[in-house]
């Protein structure tokens, strides 16, 4: 699959998903960038905005298997990864796969699970495998996690450690629909017999794997590499930031910028690609100082100030 075909495939997937989910184009783009960049997405939003429907619809459109895990305080790691069960017939243990063995996994309200269970998901996200009783099991490919957390209810939750937040390539939110969007939501509900809409499959699993490989062929000018490094360096020098973007975050920005180029149907990354992915990729990686938190500093404003402080290179590429 070439870059033009991958861009067309992205449009087809999102056009199909938009028939089921009502949200703005920026939200859909960010989800698709997570898929293309072979990363994972963190959704922080209130209940009832369509997070589960979005994850299920993306899976259906991509022709991938889908699994939903409701995280609770009593959820054990084995409830997510699976466990070894004794088979009395042949007197041996057999591995029973947990719900994480799917192409797209919705980790719902991930911050309600204890740290040990969160850590089990951490290995799966980073390594594409799980370890149970010392034995390693490979997860299906592609493997993509959409995790959600409720920003309002904090009682009885276990905030995600910075190491785990850093594993998510993109963080975004659906938000409430506009008035016209909510009316359209009701109109669609009135036109079907079931509560949840269905989505047509537009790609196969092999096509998804091929599509996710296309960003590796995108060209990135050396000046843009310098630009991205200067942006992340600037986050570490901001007086409002206690912990800036990690080197892993710099790599994720690079990967997501390439994915943005594919999404736009280009063979090369532009400065606008870097700017466009900066907020969803960088903001959630920042740890603010206590004074900044007391002053109610918005991480998005920090990213804006950083982008304004770094000189934008002039880069020109000729299409092949």
Enumerate the predicted regions with their spans.
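C-terminal engagement/docking regions of AAA+ P-loop ATPases
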Residues: 237-320
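Walker A/P-loop
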Residues: 35-73, 77, 86
